[in-house]
Amino acid sequence: MAEFDISRMNILIVEDNLHFRTHIRTILQTLGVESVEEARDGAEAFEVLLSFDADLAIIDWKMDGQNGLDCVRRIRNDEDSPNRFLPIIMVTGYTEESLARDARDIGVNDFLGKPISAKSLMSRIAAVLEDKREFIDAPDYFGPDRRRSQQEYMGEERRKK
């Protein structure tokens, strides 16, 4: 994994728990990030994004008010969304594989289980920056390509050489 300088990034933290918001902000400041905005729920996050040009959003799954899934849906699908292509890392204490799939299926770029450390957060940020997946615009989905790897074709090669 390449080293990234994230000090000039604008990062939005969406988390209803003040202590965890502060924890994430402190980690980001330790990593050199100076421009951080916060929101307590998805609705507030959308309002912040109208005036804050975020390069990345770190969004909690379960919050009072508008939850993380609804927030991501709105960012990806709302016609008034300021940035449908915003890289999004979802953080949660619920780490079941089915929940990670649900997050991926609504347009999250990456998923990080709580508790988080500076190392785990930086690893996810680097993965999102490194893995520039194409965005898919389909009738029932808008977001990063959900396929993580190329599937090997197992059939007969029919191309002429």
Q: What are the residue ranges of the model-derived segments?
A:
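Two-component/phosphorelay signaling modules centered on CheY-like receiver
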Residues: 18-37
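Alpha4 helix (beta4-alpha4-beta5 surface) of REC/receiver domains from two-component response regulators
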Residues: 25, 70, 84, 95-110, ...
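Acidic catalytic/metal-coordinating carboxylates
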Residues: 41, 67-73
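C-terminal output helix
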Residues: 98, 116-129, 133, 137
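Conserved acidic carboxylate
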Residues: 15
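CheY-like receiver
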Residues: 130-161
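The feature encodes the CheY-like receiver
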Residues: 64-65, 92, 96
